[in-house]
Amino acid sequence: MAWAALLGLLAALLLLLLLSRRRTRRPGEPPLDLGSIPWLGYALDFGKDAASFLTRMKEKHGDIFTILVGGRYVTVLLDPHSYDAVVWEPRTRLDFHAYAIFLMERIFDVQLPHYSPSDEKARMKLTLLHRELQALTEAMYTNLHAVLLGDATEAGSGWHEMGLLDFSYSFLLRAGYLTLYGIEALPRTHESQAQDRVHSADVFHTFRQLDRLLPKLARGSLSVGDKDHMCSVKSRLWKLLSPARLARRAHRSKWLESYLLHLEEMGVSEEMQARALVLQLWATQGNMGPAAFWLLLFLLKNPEALAAVRGELESILWQAEQPVSQTTTLPQKVLDSTPVLDSVLSESLRLTAAPFITREVVVDLAMPMADGREFNLRRGDRLLLFPFLSPQRDPEIYTDPEVFKYNRFLNPDGSEKKDFYKDGKRLKNYNMPWGAGHNHCLGRSYAVNSIKQFVFLVLVHLDLELINADVEIPEFDLSRYGFGLMQPEHDVPVRYRIRP
């Protein structure tokens, strides 16, 4: 009894200490909301459904506010007119490295000496643009053709059933892996292509197990069983992507060669290089499959949109100088001449891309808002932008923002629509699936080309149908807010076959 009383007294004293040290709002700071639970604050609400929670907070406090989340003070900014003041701020004031390094170490067990994301991006940029982008695009088309049509041919004639997310994710990740990390042999033979399909399928299925547990891993909420499984999956991926294994592969990308040289120059061990390569597999391939899933699902659920995209692709084929059966790549000028498909992709990403854009506040600073207001931010706090809520789902910017409209990003003359407004002012940032500012996605062009090539191959070479035409669009897996493209709560069954 005495011990119980003592523990109760200690708990009460601890609670009083926490309450006495609770932060108060200073003049010039954003509205402060600490929640009702000391230290935790709104961690449970935020983790359960970030979009719904932040919507409620915006209704309560406006487009900027500070909340307590698991001992951290997070200032949330939801005014897209003011985003540029954040994303282009120098690292000496708002740092985007610290959080990236934290996730790199926590999720992927990667520790790199003297690591600088900015230096790495500057180096990688050269391998993802211009002539190198053309080489990646051509290799991606070849590999998509090999895995998509190779698997379908191997499975035999007739219909084949699988989930649409599995369908999109597996083919895009497998082709992307072969494009960046290399193929079995050159010149390619039927045997080597079969080996590529088997090996890339092994990589995908192992990676997918990691991907499913990633939100729990990032939040430190894995069960004991999950932790054991995660250790096993990571070990398997490290073996599959070890530098020694990759050294035997042919036609490796300039991106891979440059990245491995970068790691070697930093003195990184081969074991740590393998871990870094798993991280890069997720960073380069983890969003394309889910993006293609939503795009294809919206097309399958919207006959008018599907007909418009098919019509555009048929027009491209009609203008081509060779039959589609002999097409070995889609030239960049063709990929850049698909305004309808571009609009469909932009609309699909608007509805489903939900990354967090974060900055660590390095020094006390005054942040200007676009409307003339100014708010003081404290050193040590975190600043969070969530474009999914605004601009992407903002009813002031988009009519019926929850509804898929395939031509939302098209002008009446068929050109790309870029004029969107909020509060009577034209928006610079009206759709932000690729991030912005200093951490804008370098691989955007490669990803867009890959998704468009995949859609082209699917619609031209395959019949693809929903098994249940009346199936509802699935809800989001709410645990994935902040990680890029949302994934569905459950997969959607489809069937496909090679066109006769």
Curated annotation (Swiss-Prot):
Sequence positions that bind heme: 441
Residues noted as binding substrate in the record, renumbered to the chain: 106, 112, 287, 358-359, 382
Cofactor(s) in the UniProt record: heme
Intracellular or extracellular location(s): Endoplasmic reticulum membrane
Catalytic activity: prostaglandin H2 = prostaglandin I2; a hydroperoxyeicosatetraenoate = an oxoeicosatetraenoate + H2O; (15S)-hydroperoxy-(5Z,8Z,11Z,13E)-eicosatetraenoate = 15-oxo-(5Z,8Z,11Z,13E)-eicosatetraenoate + H2O; (15S)-hydroperoxy-(5Z,8Z,11Z,13E)-eicosatetraenoate + AH2 = (15S)-hydroxy-(5Z,8Z,11Z,13E)-eicosatetraenoate + A + H2O
Tissue: Widely expressed; particularly abundant in ovary, heart, skeletal muscle, lung and prostate.
Spans traversing the lipid bilayer: 1-20
Domain of life: Eukaryota
Positions of disulphide bridges: none
GO CC term (a single one): caveola
Resulting phenotype, residue 379 to S: In allele CYP8A1*4
GO molecular function: heme binding; hydroperoxy icosatetraenoate dehydratase activity; iron ion binding; monooxygenase activity; oxidoreductase activity, acting on paired donors, with incorporation or reduction of molecular oxygen; prostaglandin-I synthase activity
EC number: 5.3.99.4, 4.2.1.152
Keywords: Endoplasmic reticulum, Fatty acid biosynthesis, Fatty acid metabolism, Heme, Iron, Isomerase, Lipid biosynthesis, Lipid metabolism, Lyase, Membrane, Metal-binding, Prostaglandin biosynthesis, Prostaglandin metabolism, Transmembrane, Transmembrane helix
GO BP annotations, alphabetical order: apoptotic signaling pathway; cellular response to hypoxia; cellular response to interleukin-1; cellular response to interleukin-6; decidualization; embryo implantation; icosanoid metabolic process; negative regulation of inflammatory response
Keyword Lipid metabolism attributed: yes
Bilayer disposition of the protein: Single-pass membrane protein
PANTHER family: PROSTACYCLIN SYNTHASE, PTHR24306
Family listed: Belongs to the cytochrome P450 family.
Its job: Catalyzes the biosynthesis and metabolism of eicosanoids. Catalyzes the isomerization of prostaglandin H2 to prostacyclin (= prostaglandin I2), a potent mediator of vasodilation and inhibitor of platelet aggregation. Additionally, displays dehydratase activity, toward hydroperoxyeicosatetraenoates (HPETEs), especially toward (15S)-hydroperoxy-(5Z,8Z,11Z,13E)-eicosatetraenoate (15(S)-HPETE).
Clinical condition linked: Essential hypertension: A condition in which blood pressure is consistently higher than normal with no identifiable cause.
Name of the protein: Prostacyclin synthase
